[in-house]
Amino acid sequence: MNYSITTLGKKTIAGFHLVGPWDQTVKQGVEQLMMWVENHQVPAREWLAVYYDNPEEVPAEKLRCATVVAVDEDYVIPANSEGVILAAVAGGDYACARARVVDYDFATPWMQFFDSLLQSTTYRVAPRPCFEIYLNDGNHDGYWDIDMYVPVERVAS
């Protein structure tokens, strides 16, 4: 899979932190997020899922993720937003790849991306969360176009 290296600034995010198998929690979290954004007219700049763990090292029932929207740095969570967190995704260097997801199979493009990235002799995966940005409404379109971001650091030569 082709990817590029890009430097991103910090992203302020608001949404829901969930624990459990990602194939269940992300879908549930996105549904919660959509209702919250609509009910509170949240000025969402981007829609993201943030992944905090390595599924090869952490049992599925303990996997952490957040379904969030990017908001302005000074955003204040509105009243009656039970369970909503305000956090940040760290800035820095990221490997970025675009993929189309069909049949809710988000795992396959991520595995292909990591397979390509792990072959790099210039960059290695950094110990920070990965995330994906949704470029369209997959529930409406029948597929999702996503940009996947993996934090990286240059390998010392």
From Swiss-Prot:
Gene3D superfamilies: Regulatory factor, effector binding domain. The keyword Cytoplasm applies. One of its GO terms (molecular function) is DNA topoisomerase type II (double strand cut, ATP-hydrolyzing) inhibitor activity. Its main location: cytoplasm. One of its GO terms (cellular component) is cytoplasm. Pfam families: GyrI-like (PF06445). Keywords: Cytoplasm, Stress response. It is found in: Cytoplasm. Coiled coil: none annotated. It comes from the Bacteria. Inhibits the supercoiling activity of DNA gyrase. Acts by inhibiting DNA gyrase at an early step, prior to (or at the step of) binding of DNA by the gyrase. It protects cells against toxins that target DNA gyrase, by inhibiting activity of these toxins and reducing the formation of lethal double-strand breaks in the cell. Interacts with DNA gyrase. Belongs to the DNA gyrase inhibitor family. This is DNA gyrase inhibitor. It comes from Klebsiella pneumoniae (strain 342). The lineage of its organism: Bacteria, Pseudomonadati, Pseudomonadota, Gammaproteobacteria, Enterobacterales.
